[in-house]
């Protein structure tokens, strides 16, 4: 049995994703009609339009399932308003293993939450690094597990609310 992970979203992101889901569901009959129209053109083996419409339908259905799962497991909250504490919705700056020159700035959120800001890396609060930093205060050092089984220390330099 798999455990459903809770995904944190702002109300704005939840509404945006719900709107996308509603549009995709409303578009189902359009794609079904396109498939039927292409099917009537004849030989399906060599019907590029038919295959393209079926592929589009598959991609759309996959996105619908992804959005339904995300929204069903979402915890809707407000973006953090305080600075200095790493919370979902915070842009954090950290350094690794005591090397203050090795810094990284990223958003603690879901990819969906940070999807509109291509310049900013996004780490999930459920990831090893994101989870280790949750509720850390500026100056706190935390340790997290790397994929190879070793651990790394990370120190929080700053945490600011994310504004999309």
Swiss-Prot record:
InterPro entries according to UniProt: GreA/GreB_C_sf (IPR036953), TF_GreA/GreB_CS (IPR018151), Tscrpt_elong_fac_GreA (IPR006359), Tscrpt_elong_fac_GreA/B (IPR028624), Tscrpt_elong_fac_GreA/B_C (IPR001437), Tscrpt_elong_fac_GreA/B_fam (IPR023459), Tscrpt_elong_fac_GreA/B_N (IPR022691), Tscrpt_elong_fac_GreA/B_N_sf (IPR036805)
* Keywords, alphabetical: Coiled coil, DNA-binding, Transcription, Transcription regulation
Q: Which residues form a coiled coil?
A: 15-76
GO MF term list: DNA binding; RNA polymerase binding
Q: What is any Pfam family matched here?
A: GreA_GreB_N
One GO term (biological process): regulation of DNA-templated transcription elongation
* PANTHER family hit by this protein: TRANSCRIPTION ELONGATION FACTOR GREA
* Stated role: Necessary for efficient RNA polymerase transcription elongation past template-encoded arresting sites. The arresting sites in DNA have the property of trapping a certain fraction of elongating RNA polymerases that pass through, resulting in locked ternary complexes. Cleavage of the nascent transcript by cleavage factors such as GreA or GreB allows the resumption of elongation from the new 3'terminus. GreA releases sequences of 2 to 3 nucleotides.
Q: What family classification does the UniProt entry report for this protein?
A: Belongs to the GreA/GreB family.
Which NCBIfam families does this one have?
greA (TIGR01462), PRK00226.1-3 (NF001262)
Name of the protein: Transcription elongation factor GreA
Organism encoding this protein:
Rhodococcus erythropolis (strain PR4 / NBRC 100887)
Q: What gene is it encoded by?
A: greA
